[in-house]
A protein has these predicted regions:
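N-terminal phosphate-binding or glycine-rich loops at protein starts, especially the Walker A/P-loop
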Residues: 1-53
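Gly-rich Lys/Arg/Thr-decorated short loops/hinges at beta-loop-alpha junctions or inter-strand turns
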Residues: 2-9, 68-82, 141-151, 182, ...
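Short, ordered loop/turn segments at secondary-structure junctions
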Residues: 11-13, 42-47, 80-81, 113-114, ...
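Short glycine/serine/threonine-rich phosphate/pyrophosphate-binding segments
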Residues: 15-25, 49-50, 91-94, 114-122, ...
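Glycine-rich oxoanion-binding loops at beta->alpha junctions
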Residues: 52-106, 115-116, 143, 168
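Accessory alpha-helical/coil subdomains and C-terminal extensions
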Residues: 99, 107-112, 120-130, 137, ...
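C-terminal non-catalytic interaction/assembly regions of soluble proteins
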Residues: 256-419
Length: 419
């Protein structure tokens, strides 16, 4: 492709390291100024492209772009907006082409999870469907760790580290209080269908620091009697117990324990609130005193405790996306390929978006213990390297010194567009 500008945007739930991927994209694009001109970021994801709300990243200093590597969440704003098919909403695709033509955009980098991969796939097909040449590369990101093909997903390692550390620390706390007060602590974590984040709670216990952790996975149907028996055994043996429960746990009726009938913009069940449900089950069934907490945004925003492995992989995915684009690739996603566990080694691979979009990677059965409440040695071997290493941000006056970009708007050239 001839010299063209590029579009970059962030989509879906943000993470502690998605900005590291942005830094990888922007710094690498600047290193290839003979092939890529300006990089325009979409304000609030693909919505920024549709509404021509573009950000001129060239207005940012090299130092500001570099600081994205240690700044959490989405520097350009994100969105939960999924493009419908060309047949269902042709006007949106025609609008994208208008925007791309008006701003001479030939490269499209979309940083997100499974639904974002679907959006990127649709954009990558514009050359065939509407005759506009574009190279669309998906930059992987999801704390849920449920994208296929790639060994792991940027964003997950840092959430896993946060959950493992929080579970260990909270367990120390409840152990201190268990003689005369709290016996059980319940931590609710993200994970609609895949239990990867919940599994990370199992890392809190190790041979040199044994902790009674009971995990409730979305992949394992919740059995109240078995669960209560497990908690009861743990409390009788250790005096206390910690429970890590995924928001996506389902009962025997197939419904989410926490389903309130709400849906998000992607049509997924809007979950949350399973921790108090589980807490009441423990109270009613065992009569134990409990405390519960919800990790919620804290787990995905905690850049101060990010995994160094995760930060490095996130940056590498952004860098590879640009390199793949200028090499002529389209409709692909850079992936993380695990080469060995001990020592942990990985490299960058490539996957076709047609094999990624709308596919969820569940926890394999061999990663879940026979009783359904813990992780296996194989799971521990998989997870452990992903939380290794510290990559602390700089601090100022006792707080992390995160960057806020100027986010200078690009002048609009087209008429207003209603979503």
């Amino acid at each position: 492709m001839a010299f063209k500008n590029a579009f970059y945007a962030q989509s879906g739930g943000v993470t502690a390291v998605i900005n590291a991927s942005a830094a990888g994209v922007l710094e690498t694009a600047r290193q290839h100024s003979d092939k890529i001109g300006n990089v325009y970021a979409g304000r609030n994801g693909i919505i920024g492209a549709l509404t021509e709300d573009l950000i001129d990243t060239n207005a940012e200093s090299a130092a500001a772009i570099a600081a994205l590597r240690h700044t959490p969440s989405g520097a350009f704003g994100s969105c939960r907006y999924k493009l419908k098919s060309l047949e269902q909403n042709r006007r949106e695709y025609e609008r994208l082409i208008e925007i791309f033509k008006a701003h001479d955009i030939g490269y499209f980098f979309y940083n997100g999870g499974g639904d974002s991969a679907d959006t990127c796939l649709k954009v990558s097909q514009l050359a065939d469907t509407l005759g506009y040449p574009i190279q669309a590369i998906h930059v992987p990101k999801t704390v849920d760790n449920d994208l296929p093909i790639t060994d792991c997903c940027p964003g997950f390692g840092s959430v896993a580290k946060y959950i493992a550390v929080s579970t260990r620390e909270a367990s120390f706390d409840v152990a201190s209080m268990s003689k005369t007060s709290t016996k059980v602590f319940i931590l609710e974590v993200m994970g609609r269908h895949a239990g990867w984040i919940a599994a990370a709670g199992g890392l809190a216990s190790s041979p040199d620091c044994e902790i009674p952790v009971v995990i409730l996975f979305p992949e394992v149907t919740f059995d109240k009697e078995k669960f209560l028996a497990k908690v009861d055994r743990c409390v009788k043996e250790f005096g206390y117990c910690s429970v890590v429960v995924s928001e996506g746990v389902k009962g025997n009726d197939g419904n989410f324990l926490s389903d309130q009938g709400l849906r998000d913009a992607f049509g997924h069940a809007q979950l949350g609130g399973v921790a108090p449900v589980v807490a009441n089950i423990i109270k009613d069934g065992l009569g134990l005193k409990y405390h519960w907490g919800v990790a919620d945004y804290l787990q995905r925003a905690a850049r101060h405790i990010a995994s160094k492995t995760d930060v490095e992989q996130a940056y590498a995915m952004g860098k590879a996306a640009v390199e793949y684009a200028i090499a002529g690739h389209n409709s692909v996603m850079p992936t993380i390929v695990r080469q060995s566990n001990a020592p942990y080694k990985w490299t960058v691979g490539m996957a076709q978006l047609s094999n990624v979009a709308n596919v969820e990677k569940m926890m394999p059965a061999e990663f879940i213990s026979d009783d359904g409440f813990g992780i296996t040695p194989a799971c521990r071997e998989y997870l452990s390297p992903l939380i290794e290493g510290e990559d602390y941000p700089p601090y100022k006056n006792g707080l992390p010194d995160y960057v806020r970009l100027k986010n200078v708007a690009v002048a609009k050239k087209l008429s207003e567009f209603k979503l």
